[in-house]
């Protein structure tokens, strides 16, 4: 067996040549993201083969990652924050005037925008939620694209509430009650009266009901529901009666709602661009399954899925529903993007984002199930290096964030980089992960630094018993909650992990919760407060401290690396500073990287390259993997 050559860090973590394509409403053009001055920007290109592409945004500070077509071919919108602070603003681009600068349509200091949606009822109008009036509250606005006029159509009645647009001028209000339940109400067009529709048990929804999409006829709302099921299904709430009925479900997979909400990667529901009718539903198990609930879309889906052995990812159509652009999720050949014309049957590849990466040199991501010590099944993924005997390998346990999230089958540059350096990579969907039923998620209540962590240790034991991993050469690495898990590995079980890498991770659970932005706190009731505790209650604060790595730094005996974004609004830099200062004060070496222009996760390519160059050196020194 021959291992592939070392692939450069730049090839893994540099910007893709093209990615994120979607088709225009009239079907004549595509937009996509591609580098301009080493930052991803939006480019426009006619669909005719051989046509010239044009860059229409000009951000050389931070990559543009989110853009929207509008129903007017003149305007395109995109969202951008500053240095990773997550305070996204809406910018307008004039596609008819290449010399015109982008215009910030929400120029309010300290505010952030989310839920930017094309109006169903008014041409040239988007709705958006923004906290410009009060940083703790999000009001709903109508935005006239051509003029930039903003009008409040739903003022927040208080923190923990949010309006969304219904049909025909109706508005829907979602709000957390004092008990943490989630209440949905309706305000009819032309009325100030808000009428209660239904209330959900908040304990079943760590992030609340993440999906509330009005039906095309305006009589109901589509939601992700676990009312009568362990697995999340698609249900409809009747806005007159509050009655809930199941619209679609899968016998063994969950509706892929919560993961997509965390990633902000779009709805699990697929709608007709012209009618707004539901046509498809995404479920996720080991791989994705899409249920077509419309006969015409079923034919489209059959032909589109035949283009790749990957899973259908980003999918867009023109208004006619005949022309489609689709990117595919894949473990070794990411986001290969095709054009498909359903009327003519024509299809062609538009691009591969990373043409310099040979899929044959990439490692296969294999689903495995590991049994925890108490018998709980742990759906996991194992990636083994190419061209290496899969025995007694150095291994990295890569822990996902959230923790109310899940790992899924797809290309991850960090995983492929580690595999190329000779490491086995194990990703465990430990208890608390979403996507496997509410019982799997709720098994994590009270188990931070407890069974959530022993699930990871059990994953190590499984990999050693299977012969894949060398017990003495196992590292733990992760971001956000995964960074917390890495610190728990370094402080609670230093005998298990030869090295730990914390990426924007929590070190002090109580301090983490105290430093959350005001607008986020009402949403913590069913996740952090329910699963971990309330730092305002002394007994619970003491328990949180006992489960925090900051309280056990004297137990750090193995090598530790920490990486932090200076502008992180979720896990503030002080979380990492405190760990580093205390360890260094007693003479313990810790590698510490701080990136001044990043937040909760790194975006700029040069920062990711710097970070993974340090990871490569750190792991090679302490686990013995390959390095340049």
Regions flagged by a language model, labelled:
Residues 224, 383, 398-399, 477, ...:
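Short hydrophobic segments within beta-strands
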Residues 13-19, 25, 29, 33-45, ...:
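Peripheral, non-catalytic segments that deliver or gate enzyme domains
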Residues 391-401:
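Short beta-strand element of the alpha/beta-hydrolase
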Residues 284, 401-402, 480, 566:
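Residue-level signal for short, function-critical loop segments
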Residues 1-3, 7:
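Sequence/structural signature of beta-propeller modules
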Residues 395, 419-429, 591:
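A fold-wide structural signal in alpha/beta-hydrolase
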Residues 430-628:
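Active-site-proximal cap/loop segments of hydrolase catalytic domains
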Residues 127, 279, 368, 397, ...:
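Hydrophobic/aromatic beta-strand patches that form the interior of the parallel beta-sheet core
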């Amino acid at each position: 067996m021959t291992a592939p050559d070392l692939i450069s860090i730049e090839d893994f973590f540099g910007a893709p040549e093209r990615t994120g394509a979607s088709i225009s409403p009239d079907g004549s053009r595509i937009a996509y993201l591609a580098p301009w001055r080493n930052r991803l920007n939006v480019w426009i290109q006619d669909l005719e083969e051989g046509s010239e592409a044009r860059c229409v945004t000009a951000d050389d500070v931070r990559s543009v990652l989110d853009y929207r077509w509008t129903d007017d071919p003149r305007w395109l919108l995109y969202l951008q924050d500053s240095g990773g602070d997550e305070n996204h603003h809406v910018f307008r681009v004039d596609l008819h005037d290449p010399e015109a600068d982008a215009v910030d349509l929400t120029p309010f200091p300290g505010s952030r925008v989310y839920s930017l949606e094309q109006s169903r009822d008014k041409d040239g109008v988007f709705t958006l939620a923004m906290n410009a009036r009060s940083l703790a509250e999000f009001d709903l606005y109508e935005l006239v694209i051509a003029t930039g006029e903003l009008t409040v159509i739903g003022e927040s009645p208080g923190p923990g509430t949010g309006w969304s647009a219904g049909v025909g001028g109706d508005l829907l209000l979602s709000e957390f009650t004092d008990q943490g339940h989630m209440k949905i109400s309706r305000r009819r067009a032309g009325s100030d009266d808000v009428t209660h529709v239904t209330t959900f048990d908040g304990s079943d929804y760590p992030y609340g009901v993440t999906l509330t999409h009005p039906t095309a006829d305006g009589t109901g709302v589509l939601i992700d529901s676990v009312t009568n099921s362990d697995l999340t299904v698609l249900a409809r709430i009747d806005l007159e009666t509050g009655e809930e009925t199941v619209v679609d479900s899968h016998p063994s997979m969950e509706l892929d709602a919560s993961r997509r909400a965390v990633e902000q990667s779009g709805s699990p529901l697929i709608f007709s661009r012209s009618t707004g009718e539901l046509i498809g539903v995404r479920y996720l198990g080991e791989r994705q399954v899409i249920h077509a609930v419309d006969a015409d879309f079923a034919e489209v889906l059959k032909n589109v899925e035949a283009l790749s052995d990957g899973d259908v990812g980003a999918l867009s159509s023109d208004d006619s529903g005949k022309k489609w652009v689709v990117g595919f999720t894949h473990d070794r050949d990411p986001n290969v993007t095709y054009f498909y014309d359903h009327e003519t049957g024509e299809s062609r590849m538009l691009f591969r984002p990373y043409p310099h990466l040979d899929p044959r040199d990439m490692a296969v991501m294999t689903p495995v199930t590991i049994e925890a010590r108490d018998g709980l099944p742990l759906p996991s993924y194992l990636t083994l290096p190419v061209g290496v005997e899969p025995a007694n390998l150095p291994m990295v346990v890569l822990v996902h964030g959230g923790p109310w999230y899940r790992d899924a089958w797809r290309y991850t540059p960090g995983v492929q980089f580690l595999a190329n350096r000779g490491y086995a990579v194990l990703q465990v969907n430990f208890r608390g992960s979403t996507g496997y039923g509410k019982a799997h998620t709720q098994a994590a209540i009270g188990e931070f630094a407890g069974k959530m962590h022993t699930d990871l240790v059990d994953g190590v034991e499984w990999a050693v018993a299977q012969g894949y991993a060398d017990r003495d050469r196992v590292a733990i690495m992760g971001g956000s909650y995964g960074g917390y898990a890495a610190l728990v590995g370094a402080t609670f079980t230093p005998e298990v992990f030869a090295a730990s890498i914390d990426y924007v991770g929590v070190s002090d659970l109580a301090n983490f919760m105290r430093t959350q932005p005001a607008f986020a706190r009402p949403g913590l009731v069913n996740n952090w407060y329910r699963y971990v505790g309330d730092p305002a209650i002394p007994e619970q604060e003491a328990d949180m401290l006992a489960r925090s790595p900051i309280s056990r730094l004297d137990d750090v005996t193995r090598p530790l690396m920490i990486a932090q974004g200076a502008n992180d609004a979720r896990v503030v830099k002080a979380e990492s500073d405190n760990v580093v200062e205390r360890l260094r004060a007693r003479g313990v070496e810790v590698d510490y990287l701080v990136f001044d222009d990043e937040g909760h996760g790194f975006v700029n390519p040069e920062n990711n390259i710097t970070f993974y160059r340090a990871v490569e050196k750190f792991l090679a020194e302490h686990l013995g993997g390959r390095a340049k």
